[in-house]
C-alpha cells in the first residue's frame, strides 16, 4: 500500500472492518491531500464548527481555509449547516487500528527505521523477522520495545505492540491511504 510516508510490506487493520465498509458506502473519493486531512481532523460529526474556529485550530488564515472547505464540501466530506458551520461526514472518522508491518530476512535495523517512519501515520509498526540468530533477535527486541512497537520472528511473538495514536491529522491521512488502496483492490480480510 502506498502510504503517506513509505511503502510498508503489509498493512493490518484491527477492529476497523466496519469503518472500511462505511467508508466505501459513503461514496466519497479517497482524500489523499495532507491539507484535507488536517482540516477534517479538527472537525466532528456531531458538533459543527465555524470557519473561524476551524482556521484557528488548523493554524491557517481564513483565506487559506475557504478553498479547502469548499472542496471538501463539494466532495461530500464536510456538511455545512444552514448557519454556515461545518461538520465532518461520520464515515471519515477512523475506527480501528492500523499497523504497518515490515518484513526483513536479516536487516532488522532497516526494518526498525522504516517502522519508525510509518508511525507518523500508523497506530504502530511490527517488524517481521526471518531466521536470525538470538543476538539479532535480542537487539531487535530492545529497539522495538523502546518504541512500544512489535516484533514477530519465526518462533512467534517476541514483543507485542502497545496501543498508541499518531497525531489525528496524520492518522486520518494514513486511513485515507488505506481506503484508497482497498478501493482499488480487494483486500484480504
Name each model feature, range by range.
Residues 23-41, 50, 102-154:
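Catalytic cores of nucleic-acid endonucleases
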Residues 45-58:
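Short acidic, hydrophobic short linear motifs in intrinsically disordered regions
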Residues 59-67:
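Short, basic interhelical loop/turn and adjoining N-cap
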Residues 43, 54, 67-78:
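Basic amphipathic alpha-helical segments that dock to polyanions
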Residues 2-4, 16-38, 55, 86-89, ...:
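Non-catalytic C-terminal interaction segments of nucleic acid-processing enzymes
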Residues 40-42, 47, 71, 93:
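N-terminal targeting/trafficking signals and adjacent low-complexity tails
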Residues 9-22, 96-105:
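Conserved catalytic cores of phosphodiester-cleaving nucleases, focusing on short active-site segments
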Residues 77-88:
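Charged low-complexity interaction tracts in eukaryotic proteins
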